[in-house]
A protein has these predicted regions:
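Outer-membrane beta-barrel translocator domains and adjoining extracellular loop/strand segments
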Residues: 211-212, 277-282, 355-371, 415-429, ...
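Conserved C-terminal beta-signal and adjacent last beta-strands/turns
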Residues: 787-808, 820-924
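Transmembrane beta-strand segments that form the barrel wall of outer-membrane beta-barrel proteins
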Residues: 233-243, 265-267, 594-595, 664, ...
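Signature of Gram-negative outer-membrane beta-barrel scaffolds
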Residues: 526-630, 818-820
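Membrane-proximal, glycine/serine-rich, low-complexity loop/turn segments characteristic
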Residues: 62, 66, 76, 83, ...
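Outer membrane beta-barrel strand-and-loop segments of large Gram-negative receptors
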Residues: 376, 510-512, 556-563, 669, ...
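Extracellular loop and loop/strand-boundary signature of outer-membrane beta-barrel proteins
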Residues: 239, 315-318, 371-378, 430-438, ...
């Protein structure tokens, strides 16, 4: 009896002691004026013995500390641009302690240049890196893009943004989507003076954010954290200008923010190559073939051609040449009651582009001795695009939620193209082609994602289901007139002319699902079990008709250039994952056992089918270790499979350029890729920021180009002849592809000139396998890019930035050992903005681009733009500016690239010099 009583007392004592260490402190941090939650605020809980617990607030401003012993603590909360909050809190021996904190803006902090300001230049908060916008001063009236360009580890160049060595795919505003995350719409239209901080992180998918397990779908994301005073009110900017050469530009953006409800209106129209949005232009991507773009045909990395890119990546930047753009959009964010959250946007844009491009190609002597290629291309392209996006979140209960995200877009593309290509052998004409093309494409994309999420009563146990469906359709018509000339050794020539109509219909359906179950195993470990299914069905129907000399109609079907092909790719995977999280260490290990079925069916001109089945083990691993508040290390590894596109599988000849024919390959296999990267971050209280990143990618069964050159005229089909000197390319699977990437960035302030300096060095290496004339080769490219940026941090009235980078390019092929493959790209820039007495403003941008080490000698140009303005009205809300573009009249667009057996030198048309007077009004 005594023994039993003793055990009872021991058990009660043990339970009591455990309860002492099982208390929870939670709360919400909000802005005093707007009452909105502050995202990524730093929360410290300091015990009586000095031990400090850290966390940060989530997207709702909430925080939580678990398993705390009872006692008295000091709660300290800091946030960029706000006064630090400090309070003594008592954790009871039982129950949960809740604290609601409101924070006030620190108006004095915004004008201080001190050690304290430097201390918040950049901070690590969990998996995020948060920059203090007040530590990077830009001129009043600047955009978010100007602010980002001054921050270490962020590169703004060529209409895209890179952060920590990766391209930024999404931009949020206070954790909320802004025009479906369109990068350019956010950074080019939002003013810099509303920004309190910039948060850089890898955004996981909605399902992964819920479960805590990565699914490989994370994208580099920037979250623009606005100042509390701008979360309720109206702000924006409108401007209009007209100048010489009939140049004009009109821009406007107005934002109505009222706590949870946010409405943004955008509009723009100009003919000066300004495109303040990303263009979702599937029709433009697919129609690029109408203007002469082709596999192996000549402008890899070229600037200013037709729309480039992958047809699965609809968001593309502005084109080369000269572009007129019009756009109009609305973004809506709101919370309907306590259960509904809605985000929606509509955007329309129209663009008209004229590109004139000259390409000069030199082949390696070992592959095509004495052979050169010259091409002139002119294309006129008009695009219309409508896109709708909605995101609905419904909180069914406190443990169950539903998210529905439908999308819809329409595109139309009209193009006119002229292409003149000439092959020369030892300086003498060998063969040439001239094509005139008229094309029209219509496309639509519709899709929807549905996510059901449930948290069970047991902590760590969740169940979630994701369902996704997408459908795309493109209908195109292309009319082409051909004139081909073949020269003989004795100087005689033979010409052939014909016309054809190409009708294409491309459809694709994609269905995906992901069922995930998580279970807490211990206080530090969680298990995930999942099942994934994905199916993509693609169809490409291409019919080519010749023009009859008798009827003058396109009524003669060319079977050798016609094909109907269907492909299907089904993957099923069972997945298991383990997540371990204890203090500063967080790791996740996962593995997918995937079964895949790749099917190809040729329907026309004759029936044929192929089927490939695969089994793959696809592991993944993520590890993050926070050495302390200022140092962190992250390691990530991913593996995945991908199927070849239907156009790569379709064995039909593309004769857009008769000198460079191409066709698909139905025998292609799926690709497997393995990607790993290691990243180290260090931020100090003295304002120093250091980022180091190294990564590698290996691809198995890489889809490479296999090209051969006709030594004599070759008949490929009864109606298609590969003329002497012309090339034929088709895709093949090859092993041996790998790439290496690395980046170092070091940023620090210099007080005596009140500026920030960012030093960076990136190094990239790629090994690309190819086949040329039956010989396997490797094309290797090494790029080293050192860069220095000096940005002022004086005041909003004086802003300057100076930068220089040297792109050291060493490219060589196993087909050629000749010199001339090394060149250096020099890029320098100086930017000055100054508001001086009587509200006068002066702005100047000076850019230099030069190439050295080329066979053509040194090529370079300067681009200098100036403006002088006068601010007036209350708070200097209005400004009149006189602007001059290309003062030195040197603007050019040229670039250089390398292929498996050639070098390209490319020049494009550019915007000519003009002067403009404009009016700008700031809404506050």
């Amino acid at each position: 009896m005594f023994t039993r009583v003793r055990f009872v007392f021991l058990g009660v004592a043990l339970l009591c002691s455990l309860s002492v260490f099982a208390q929870t402190l939670s709360g919400v941090v909000t802005d005093q004026k707007s009452r909105e939650g502050l995202i990524s605020a730093t929360v410290q809980l300091i015990a009586g013995d000095g031990k400090i617990n850290y966390t940060s607030t989530d997207l709702k401003g909430m925080f939580q500390f678990k398993k705390l012993p009872a006692g008295t603590y000091t709660l300290q909360i800091s946030y960029v641009g706000y006064k630090t909050y400090k309070e003594a809190v008592v954790i009871p021996s039982s129950g949960e302690k809740k604290v609601n904190v409101t924070m006030r803006e620190d108006v004095n902090l915004l004008d201080e240049v001190s050690v304290n300001a430097r201390a918040t230049r950049a901070e690590q908060k969990g998996d995020s890196l948060l920059y203090n916008a007040e530590a990077f001063k830009v001129m009043q009236g600047s955009s978010a893009e100007d602010l980002l360009a001054k921050m270490p580890g962020i590169v703004v160049e060529g209409g895209s943004i890179q952060a920590q060595g990766e391209e930024v795919k999404k931009v949020l505003v206070d954790g909320k989507e802004f025009f479906d995350g369109d990068v350019n719409l956010a950074i080019k239209n939002l003013p810099s003076d509303i920004i309190a901080g910039i948060e850089v992180f890898d955004k996981k998918s909605e399902q992964a954010e819920f479960t805590g397990f990565d699914d490989g779908e994370e994208v580099k994301t920037i979250n623009i954290v606005t100042k509390g005073g701008f979360r309720q009110g109206t702000f924006g900017e409108v401007s209009a200008g007209y100048g010489t050469e009939d140049r004009y530009k009109v821009n406007g953006n107005v934002n109505f923010f009222n706590e949870d409800r946010r409405i943004s209106l955008l509009g723009m129209s100009n003919n000066v190559n300004q495109q303040n949005f990303s263009q979702e232009d599937l029709a433009g991507v697919i129609s690029s073939g109408a203007s002469g773009k082709r596999r192996g045909g000549g402008r890899n990395g070229g600037r200013g051609g037709a729309f480039g890119g992958n047809a699965s990546d609809f968001m593309v930047g502005s084109t080369g040449g000269v572009t007129s753009s019009n756009g109009l959009g609305i973004n809506y964010v709101d919370q309907w009651g306590e259960k509904w959250k809605v985000t929606g946007s509509y955007f329309f844009n129209q663009s008209d582009n004229l590109t004139q491009q000259q390409t000069e190609r030199e082949y390696f002597d070992s592959s095509l001795p004495g052979m050169t290629y010259s091409e002139y291309q002119e294309s006129s392209m008009k695009n219309w695009n409508h896109r709708f996006n909605v995101k609905l979140d419904y909180q069914i209960s406190n443990r169950t939620s539903l998210q529905f995200r439908p999308t819809l877009s329409f595109q139309n593309n009209d193009s006119h193209g002229l292409l003149q290509g000439l092959n020369l052998l030892n300086g003498m004409s060998d063969n040439e082609t001239e094509t005139a093309t008229l094309g029209e494409n219509d496309a639509y994309n519709v899709g929807a994602d549905l996510i059901l999420r449930h948290r069970f009563l047991k902590e760590g146990r969740t169940l979630s289901l994701m369902l996704s469906g997408k459908m795309s359709n493109t209908d195109g018509n292309t009319y082409t007139d051909y004139l081909n000339t073949l020269y003989s050794a004795d100087g005689l020539s033979e010409t052939d002319s014909y016309s054809q109509w190409k009708q294409t219909l491309n459809r694709q359906y994609t269905l995906r699902s992901n069922l995930s179950y998580t279970e807490r195993l211990t206080d530090y470990m969680q298990l995930q079990l999942g099942y994934k299914l994905s199916y993509t069905d693609s169809e490409n129907d291409r019919k080519t008709y010749k023009k009859s000399a008798v009827s003058d109609l396109y009524d003669q079907l060319d079977e050798s250039l016609s094909n109907e092909y269907q492909s299907g790719y089904l993957t099923q995977a069972g997945s298991v994952g383990l997540r371990y999280r204890a203090g500063k260490f967080n790791a996740m290990l996962g593995v997918d056992a995937q079964w895949a079925d790749l099917r190809g069916d040729m329907v026309y001109p004759q029936a044929d089918n192929l089927s490939h089945r695969y089994f793959s083990i696809l592991p993944s691993f993520t590890m993050r270790y926070s050495l302390d508040r200022t140092n962190s290390l992250q390691l990530r590894y991913r593996s995945k499979s991908s199927a070849p596109s239907v156009t790569s599988l379709q064995n039909v000849i593309d004769n857009s350029n008769p000198l460079f024919l191409s066709a698909g390959n139905p025998d292609l296999d799926q690709q497997l890729s393995h990607t790993a990267n290691l990243r180290y971050l260090r931020t100090t209280k003295s304002g120093h920021t250091f980022i180091a990143m190294v990564g590698a990618t290996i691809q198995q069964d890489y889809v490479a180009d296999s090209t051969f050159v006709a030594k004599e005229d070759m008949e490929l089909t009864p109606s298609v002849t590969l003329s002497k000197g012309a090339q034929f390319t088709r895709p093949v699977n090859m092993d041996g592809y790998y790439s290496l990437q690395s980046m170092l960035t070091y940023g620090f302030p210099i007080d005596f000139i009140r500026s920030n300096i960012n030093l960076s060095l990136s190094a990239n290496y790629a090994n690309v396998p190819t086949i040329f004339d039956g010989i396997e080769s490797k094309t290797r490219e090494l790029n080293l890019i050192p860069k220095i940026i000096i940005g002022s941090n004086i005041s909003n009235n004086l802003d300057f930035t100076a930068s220089y980078s040297a792109g050291i390019n060493k490219m060589f092929s196993s087909l050629d050992t000749a010199t001339g493959s090394d060149y250096v790209t020099h890029t320098a820039s100086a930017k000055l903005g100054w508001t001086f007495f009587w509200g006068l403003t002066f702005r100047s941008t000076f850019d230099y681009i030069g190439y050295t080490g080329l066979d053509t000698g040194t090529e370079d140009y300067f681009l200098w733009n100036l403006s002088l303005g006068k601010k007036f009205l209350k708070n200097n809300a209005a400004e009149i500016r006189v602007e001059a573009f290309d003062v030195l009249k040197q603007n050019q667009a040229f670039t250089h690239s390398i292929g498996s057996n050639y070098y390209d030198y490319i020049n494009s048309n550019v915007l000519k010099p003009y002067a403009m007077i404009s009016f700008v009004y700031t809404i506050r």
